Amino acid sequence: RSEDGGTKIYGASGRVKRPGLWELPMGTTIREIIDEHALGMQDGYCFRGVIPGGASTDFLVAEHLDTPMDFGSVTRAGSRLGTGTMIVLDDRTCPVGMVHNLEKFFARESCGWCTPCRDCLPWTAATLEALEDGRGEEGDLEILESHCWMMSPGHTFCALAPGAAEPLGSALKYF
């Protein structure tokens, strides 16, 4: 079933009928976790995407629902397994607002030691807030993309900024 053996604690939060944690075989698919263990999306909501491994992992979308939740499969799909606690995004929640919340969290948690965290994260959060409120400006998306590059591995002292860049970059790609 999976290239990784044993079991793992998986979780699902968001507009699912039964948010929670479950110990399941490694490699259980995203679809099975959402549909069978979290009992699907709440009435009136449809699946839009998922952050499969916690706040610092890339979004996956409907084409990835049959991805086994193991290290190799999730990596090949374009994200990371991380904690295995999925944040499920529905079709009525604004992806910009969701990513804005995540970037505010990362900006608040930054120690401020390196430039990408100290400068990019607060600016990124403010730009996402402006976009969400309809105050975006031409060129904002390109600047956000450049911030993803500046916050990528090799440009920072620790993994905080690269973790913040993952959901931002994938949201720019998918939404």
Where on the chain are the PLM-derived regions?
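Redox cofactor-anchoring modules in respiratory/redox and cofactor-processing assemblies
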Residues: 1-175
